[in-house]
């Protein structure tokens, strides 16, 4: 429904502006509309709940073409003439119309019957003539049939009217006569014992009411043909408001169809009814109005009944009974209806004045609703229909009494000026009309009876549904369902006989208990109620204001808590009929008056049982070899409200993001302090702070990852002009160089580093600065450098050049790339390094220098030479540059350093781990890392390494190096004599380096070959051990020819290699065979073969451990033996290569070498060289130039 339908009922004009005022003020049953003079029949419906479920399962029937299109109230047409169905009266308003006297009631009955004579076939089989002269359910059932038969069944109007009149008056007279004590004696005691009286009254006259209804239904004609489409809640729709509801129900189920053609019976009832009308003249006028508005329709229009009213007739009769003046209360009616075994609460709540949708306060015409979609209270209901009748009948409501009914009528008459959107203390005329037609949703009205049990209801205002014009089969369904419901109601226990509820907890379990609270509210408003029951009218106005706010403005504030029906919505009961499933079950909160006599606990709140959260679905495979898939799903409506946050990061991602953000903040802050615009002290402090951060490896990682190193040094490009800033910058570079990974330096950063190296620390520059400030900066840098690896750093001599040199050495040592080698040469870095080497060598030549300075000089020279070695390997440009730099300054310094080291290594002998000098004096330093011998050893290896690179495949380098005085002799000593002063594991290295240097010197230089051949040297220190006693004289002889010493070295190493090979072959031949595993045996058990381990004794375990240890020792010995064999082979190979190089282009040298060889055969040398070449090709240890040289020597020796 759209909001355009709200125009009819939201008029804000003055009193008397509506056509309905004629009905209220003049008490006339005719209404002048644009279709003409029509008889107005209003049926007080129950209050509709504020719930509107979707009706998706109910098929809508197409409209019958022959139906009368002249809708008297225009619910199917335009906005201006949208009529109000009088049957949609609010439950509370219907109950507020109570009979004041028997004469008034008789007059109302007479007027109702007169009006009904103008209406054609408005009543279904289950007529509610006895329930306020017409049950809403019957009119609803007969809706579609009667609509389609309006032009045809005019002849039946008078008969129907007579039947209704006679039936109703007869039943009413009997009810009034038999149960007058129930009608009037409870006027004052309704609040005390309403439930019991209601039960008595409703059981007393149920049969008679049903009989009259059946007669009326039979006269009206069968209208329902398709029971399958009718609503399954028919029987329960009926609520026992009247005392004769039980009799009415008994007769209805039996005589409904049988009396269809029984015209004689109709006539009898008509006559009897007329006779009884004369005896009921004293009935209240309210009863007449109620019957007129809710039962009868004008003669020129169809009956506006809800399509599902077949089961709702009892609910209508509840309200009729409340208005008839009978002492039955609304709660009793609801308990009667719940006896039917159906969801009476749904029907009761269906009459709530407003829908849950936007069309608040709207009522719908009965003619527009599908028969299966309507309830007693003119509200569309769509529910699971699986709740039992006991679900809503926990307690009985209290009886209003005659005084209460009089009070209700007075309230209606005085509160017609209020609109539904304007709450006030007194009801306006418009409010009365809205309440009269069921458009105001009041807590105190009877509509709240369905509040607790109508959580699954869907409310629609009648008059706007396309299902109203459905076929006749829908009415047939309703008829059959009503019959079953009547029987069920007849057999069901009446909850009205239960004691009144003690608190609002009882009202949560049933619909009738909620109606009980509503009836109590009615009683409060009645003018004739005693003071103990009566409440001020202002309280009623306040409740109306609160209810209006709740309906039209959202949740209202109430002194009491909301009351829910705690029963589950999806648990069917045995007596319930299946109904159309509900798409979205909802819960409607029911608010009770805080001043109810029976409500003791105002703060009790019972939440309903939670619905099934998980739905199990089983998918049957459609193809073979597929499995059945079972899934558990939860509907979105059943899930709790939660906020979905997309793209949530993982914990590790969040931590990483936080770290990155912290780094970004720090670096941005520190960079802002490094700018040249900042004061000098600020820049120095920022640099030291950044260096402190860089002491952490993680921060250095961030700097490299984000490329911030170059940016930092670019900002500090002018630091060389400030002594303190340059010192801080050098400290920052040093800290960054501590990382094992390459520091991403660009050309500008390297240039800055080299410029810092060039700074001279003279006194004049030092005086320019405050000495105190410099000391502070140095102290900070010293503490900072203590936290990092500072093996080679002199903490007592922290200068800019020293820090920059250490940085450069740490960067270029083993980690310098090709671009770095080139930039270092182009920017002048190599010059500074060569100068540093010269400086260190000069310190070595001083005799008075103490050992600490000696070690520092040795470490400085060694580190500079390591850098030069790394930048000259496989780089001819750098080699040539260094050879030519300052007339071979590097070669000269290296030669001097090598000679100093030869002298120092003899002084600080480290052979056999004996740390002693020649005079047997203990060394001043026992720490190996600071030992002089270790420093000398490392420095010797660095010097020979640089010379190897400068002389490799370079004749110029070889010549320049060979020209150095004593260099060839020193190299020969490194091969023959120096290894004896070194530890065993270091001898091989120094010997191979010496042999390699000699090979490079003599390979391309004839001068060097000549010098070496004519040189006198000592024999190898270990030649005597291999020669035995017979060669002892050679060792004592002292000096020998260099060629003879080299041939002797070759023969010794070659013999040692052959001996090692023979031992290895024996080890291979004597390898033990695999012994039988004695740890267990295979056994066959139970038809299976299993390995069963034998129990080991302690002795066996110890023996096994000993064997394992022996095997490990043997393996170590084998490895050592193999290593010794390899060393011997390599030394022999290098010696043979050196001898081969001496023999090139020199027949004299060939003859000299042949003399010292066994039998003068070079085959022993060529075989060793071939093995070495194969090994070199296998390991790719050297470049192609070395392999070519070996191949050339082999070829030459083979042709000798």
From Swiss-Prot:
<keyword id="KW-0132">Cell division</keyword>
<dbReference type="GO" id="GO:0071168">
    <property type="term" value="P:protein localization to chromatin"/>
</dbReference>
<dbReference type="InterPro" id="IPR016024">
    <property type="entry name" value="ARM-type_fold"/>
</dbReference>
<feature type="compositionally biased region" description="Basic and acidic residues">
    <location>
        <begin position="540"/>
        <end position="549"/>
    </location>
</feature>
<feature type="compositionally biased region" description="Low complexity">
    <location>
        <begin position="503"/>
        <end position="513"/>
    </location>
</feature>
<dbReference type="GO" id="GO:0072686">
    <property type="term" value="C:mitotic spindle"/>
</dbReference>
<feature type="domain" description="WAPL">
    <location>
        <begin position="635"/>
        <end position="1179"/>
    </location>
</feature>
<feature type="compositionally biased region" description="Basic and acidic residues">
    <location>
        <begin position="54"/>
        <end position="64"/>
    </location>
</feature>
<dbReference type="GO" id="GO:0005829">
    <property type="term" value="C:cytosol"/>
</dbReference>
<feature type="region of interest" description="Disordered">
    <location>
        <begin position="171"/>
        <end position="235"/>
    </location>
</feature>
<feature type="compositionally biased region" description="Polar residues">
    <location>
        <begin position="1082"/>
        <end position="1094"/>
    </location>
</feature>
<dbReference type="GO" id="GO:0005654">
    <property type="term" value="C:nucleoplasm"/>
</dbReference>
<dbReference type="GO" id="GO:0051301">
    <property type="term" value="P:cell division"/>
</dbReference>
<feature type="region of interest" description="Disordered">
    <location>
        <begin position="1"/>
        <end position="23"/>
    </location>
</feature>
<dbReference type="GO" id="GO:0005737">
    <property type="term" value="C:cytoplasm"/>
</dbReference>
<dbReference type="GO" id="GO:0008156">
    <property type="term" value="P:negative regulation of DNA replication"/>
</dbReference>
<feature type="modified residue" description="Phosphoserine">
    <location>
        <position position="355"/>
    </location>
</feature>
<keyword id="KW-0175">Coiled coil</keyword>
<feature type="short sequence motif" description="FGF motif 1">
    <location>
        <begin position="73"/>
        <end position="75"/>
    </location>
</feature>
<keyword id="KW-0131">Cell cycle</keyword>
<feature type="short sequence motif" description="FGF motif 3">
    <location>
        <begin position="462"/>
        <end position="464"/>
    </location>
</feature>
<feature type="modified residue" description="Phosphothreonine">
    <location>
        <position position="286"/>
    </location>
</feature>
<feature type="region of interest" description="Disordered">
    <location>
        <begin position="327"/>
        <end position="354"/>
    </location>
</feature>
<comment type="function">
    <text>Regulator of sister chromatid cohesion in mitosis which negatively regulates cohesin association with chromatin. Involved in both sister chromatid cohesion during interphase and sister-chromatid resolution during early stages of mitosis. Couples DNA replication to sister chromatid cohesion. Cohesion ensures that chromosome partitioning is accurate in both meiotic and mitotic cells and plays an important role in DNA repair.</text>
</comment>
<feature type="modified residue" description="Phosphoserine">
    <location>
        <position position="226"/>
    </location>
</feature>
<keyword id="KW-0498">Mitosis</keyword>
<dbReference type="GO" id="GO:0045875">
    <property type="term" value="P:negative regulation of sister chromatid cohesion"/>
</dbReference>
<feature type="modified residue" description="Phosphoserine">
    <location>
        <position position="77"/>
    </location>
</feature>
<feature type="modified residue" description="Phosphoserine">
    <location>
        <position position="914"/>
    </location>
</feature>
<feature type="region of interest" description="Mediates interaction with the cohesin complex">
    <location>
        <begin position="1"/>
        <end position="668"/>
    </location>
</feature>
<comment type="similarity">
    <text>Belongs to the WAPL family.</text>
</comment>
<feature type="region of interest" description="Disordered">
    <location>
        <begin position="466"/>
        <end position="562"/>
    </location>
</feature>
<dbReference type="GO" id="GO:0045171">
    <property type="term" value="C:intercellular bridge"/>
</dbReference>
<dbReference type="GO" id="GO:0035562">
    <property type="term" value="P:negative regulation of chromatin binding"/>
</dbReference>
<dbReference type="InterPro" id="IPR011989">
    <property type="entry name" value="ARM-like"/>
</dbReference>
<dbReference type="InterPro" id="IPR012502">
    <property type="entry name" value="WAPL_dom"/>
</dbReference>
<feature type="region of interest" description="Disordered">
    <location>
        <begin position="45"/>
        <end position="102"/>
    </location>
</feature>
<dbReference type="Pfam" id="PF07814">
    <property type="entry name" value="WAPL"/>
</dbReference>
<feature type="modified residue" description="Phosphoserine">
    <location>
        <position position="468"/>
    </location>
</feature>
<feature type="coiled-coil region">
    <location>
        <begin position="266"/>
        <end position="293"/>
    </location>
</feature>
<keyword id="KW-0963">Cytoplasm</keyword>
<keyword id="KW-0597">Phosphoprotein</keyword>
């Amino acid at each position: 429904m759209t909001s355009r339908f709200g125009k009819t009922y939201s008029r804000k004009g003055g009193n008397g502006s509506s056509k309905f005022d004629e009905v209220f003020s003049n008490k006339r049953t005719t209404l002048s509309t644009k279709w003409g003079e029509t008889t107005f029949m209003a049926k007080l419906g129950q209050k509709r709940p504020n719930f509107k479920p979707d009706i998706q399962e109910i098929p809508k029937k197409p409209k019958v073409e022959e139906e009368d299109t002249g809708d008297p109230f225009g619910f199917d047409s335009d906005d201006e003439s949208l009529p109000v169905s009088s049957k949609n009266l609010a439950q509370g308003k219907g109950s507020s119309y109570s009979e004041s006297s028997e004469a008034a009631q008789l007059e109302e009955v007479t007027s109702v019957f007169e009006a009904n004579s103008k209406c054609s076939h408005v009543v279904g089989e289950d007529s509610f003539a006895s329930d306020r002269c017409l049950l809403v359910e019957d009119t609803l059932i007969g809706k579609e049939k009667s609509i389609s038969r309006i032009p045809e069944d005019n002849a039946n109007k008078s008969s129907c009217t007579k039947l209704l009149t006679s039936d109703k008056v007869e039943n009413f007279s009997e009810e009034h006569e038999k149960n007058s004590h129930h009608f009037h004696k409870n006027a004052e005691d309704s609040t005390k014992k309403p439930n019991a009286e209601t039960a008595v009254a409703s059981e007393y006259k149920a049969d008679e009411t049903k009989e009259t209804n059946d007669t009326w239904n039979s006269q009206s004609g069968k209208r329902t043909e398709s029971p399958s489409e009718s609503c399954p809640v028919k029987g329960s729709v009926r609520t026992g408001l009247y005392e004769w509801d039980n009799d009415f129900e008994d007769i209805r189920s039996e005589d409904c169809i049988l009396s269809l053609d029984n015209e004689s019976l109709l006539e009898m009832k008509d006559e009897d009814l007329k006779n009884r009308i004369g005896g009921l003249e004293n009935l209240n006028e309210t009863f007449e109005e109620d019957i007129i508005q809710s039962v009868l329709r004008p003669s020129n229009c169809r009956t506006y009944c809800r399509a599902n009213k077949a089961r709702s007739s009892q609910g209508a009769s509840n309200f009729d009974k409340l208005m008839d003046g009978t002492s039955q209360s609304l709660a009793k009616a609801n308990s009667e209806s719940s006896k039917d075994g159906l969801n009476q609460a749904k029907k009761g709540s269906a009459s709530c004045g407003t829908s849950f949708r936007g069309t608040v306060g709207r009522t719908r015409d009965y003619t527009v609703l599908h028969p299966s979609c309507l309830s007693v209270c003119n509200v569309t209901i769509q529910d699971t229909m699986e709740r039992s009748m006991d679900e809503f009948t926990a307690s009985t409501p209290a009886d209003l009494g005659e005084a209460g009914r009089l009070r209700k009528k007075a309230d209606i008459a005085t509160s017609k000026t209020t609109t539904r959107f304007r709450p006030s203390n007194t009801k306006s005329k418009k409010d009365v009309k809205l309440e009269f037609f069921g458009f105001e949703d009041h807590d105190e009205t009877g509509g709240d009876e369905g509040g607790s049990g109508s959580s699954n209801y869907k409310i629609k205002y009648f008059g706007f549904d396309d299902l109203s014009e459905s076929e006749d089969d829908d009415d047939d369904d309703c008829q059959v369902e009503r019959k079953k419901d009547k029987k069920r109601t007849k057999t069901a226990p009446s909850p009205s006989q239960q004691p009144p509820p003690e608190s609002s907890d009882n009202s949560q379990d049933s619909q009738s208990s909620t109606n009980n609270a509503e009836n109590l509210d009615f009683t409060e408003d009645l003018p004739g109620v005693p003071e103990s029951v009566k409440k001020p009218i202002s309280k009623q106005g306040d409740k109306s204001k609160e209810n209006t706010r709740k309906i039209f403005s959202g949740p209202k504030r109430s002194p009491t808590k909301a009351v829910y029906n705690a029963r589950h919505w999806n648990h069917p009961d045995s007596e319930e009929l299946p109904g159309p499933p509900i798409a979205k079950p909802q819960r409607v909160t029911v608010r009770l008056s805080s001043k109810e006599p029976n409500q003791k606990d105002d703060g009790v709140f019972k939440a309903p049982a939670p619905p099934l959260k998980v739905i199990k679905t089983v998918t049957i495979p459609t193809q073979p070899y597929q499995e059945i898939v079972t899934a558990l799903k939860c509907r979105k409506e059943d899930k709790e409200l939660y906020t979905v946050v997309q793209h949530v990061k993982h914990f590790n991602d969040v931590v990483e993001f936080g770290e990155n953000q912290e780094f970004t903040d720090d670096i941005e802050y520190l960079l802002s302090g490094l700018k040249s615009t900042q004061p000098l002290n600020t820049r120095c402090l920022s640099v030291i702070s950044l260096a402190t951060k860089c002491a952490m490896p993680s921060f250095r990682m961030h700097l490299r990852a984000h490329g911030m190193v170059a940016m930092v040094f670019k900002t500090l490009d002018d630091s060389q002009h400030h002594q303190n800033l340059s010192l801080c910058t050098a400290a920052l570079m040093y800290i960054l160089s501590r990382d094992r990974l390459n520091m991403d330096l660009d050309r500008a950063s390297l240039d800055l580093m080299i410029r810092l190296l060039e700074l001279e620390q003279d006194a004049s520059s030092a005086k320019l600065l405050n000495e105190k400030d410099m000391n502070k900066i140095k102290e900070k840098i010293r503490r900072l450098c203590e936290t990092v690896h500072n093996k080679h750093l002199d903490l007592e001599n922290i200068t800019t050049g020293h820090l920059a040199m250490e940085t450069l050495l740490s960067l270029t040592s083993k980690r310098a790339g090709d671009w770095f080698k080139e930039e270092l040469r182009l920017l002048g870095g190599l010059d500074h390094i060569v100068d540093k080497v010269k400086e260190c060598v000069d310190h070595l030549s001083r005799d008075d220098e103490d050992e600490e300075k000696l070690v520092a000089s040795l470490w400085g020279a060694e580190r500079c030479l390591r850098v030069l070695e790394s930048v000259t390997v496989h780089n001819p440009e750098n080699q040539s540059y260094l050879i030519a730099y300052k007339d071979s300054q590097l070669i000269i310094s290296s030669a001097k350093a090598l000679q100093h080291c030869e002298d120092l290594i003899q002084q600080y002998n480290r052979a056999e781990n004996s740390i002693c000098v020649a005079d047997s004096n203990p060394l001043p330093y026992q720490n190996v890392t600071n030992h002089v011998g270790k420093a000398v050893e490392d420095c010797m290896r660095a010097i020979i390494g640089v010379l190897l690179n400068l002389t490799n495949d370079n004749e110029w380098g070889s010549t320049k190096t060979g020209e150095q005085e004593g260099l060839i002799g020193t190299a020969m000593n490194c091969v023959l004599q120096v290894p004896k002063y070194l530890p065993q594991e270091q001898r091989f290295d120094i010997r191979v380096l010496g042999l390699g240097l000699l090979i490079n010197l003599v390979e391309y230089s004839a001068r060097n070959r000549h010098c070496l051949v004519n040189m006198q040297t000592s024999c190898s220190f270990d030649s005597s051990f291999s020669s035995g006693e017979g060669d002892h004289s050679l060792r004592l002889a002292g000096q020998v020819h260099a060629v003879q010493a080299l041939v002797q070295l070759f023969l010794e190493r070659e013999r040692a290699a052959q001996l090692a090979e023979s031992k290895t072959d024996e080890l291979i031949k004597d390898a033990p065979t695999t012994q039988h595993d004695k740890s267990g045996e295979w056994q066959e058990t139970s038809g299976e073969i299993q390995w069963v381990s034998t129990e080991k004794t302690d002795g066996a375990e110890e023996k096994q451990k000993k064997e394992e240890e022996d095997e490990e020792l043997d393996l170590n010995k084998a490895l050592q033996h193999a290593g010794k064999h390899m060393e011997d082979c390599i030394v022999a190979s290098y010696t043979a290569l050196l001898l081969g190089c001496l023999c090139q282009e020199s027949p004299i040298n060939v003859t000299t070498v042949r003399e010292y060889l066994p039998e003068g055969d070079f085959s022993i040398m060529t075989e060793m060289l071939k093995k070495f070449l194969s090994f070199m090709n296998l390991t790719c240890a050297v470049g192609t130039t070395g392999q070519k040289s070996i191949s050339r020597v082999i070829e030459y020796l083979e042709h000798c």
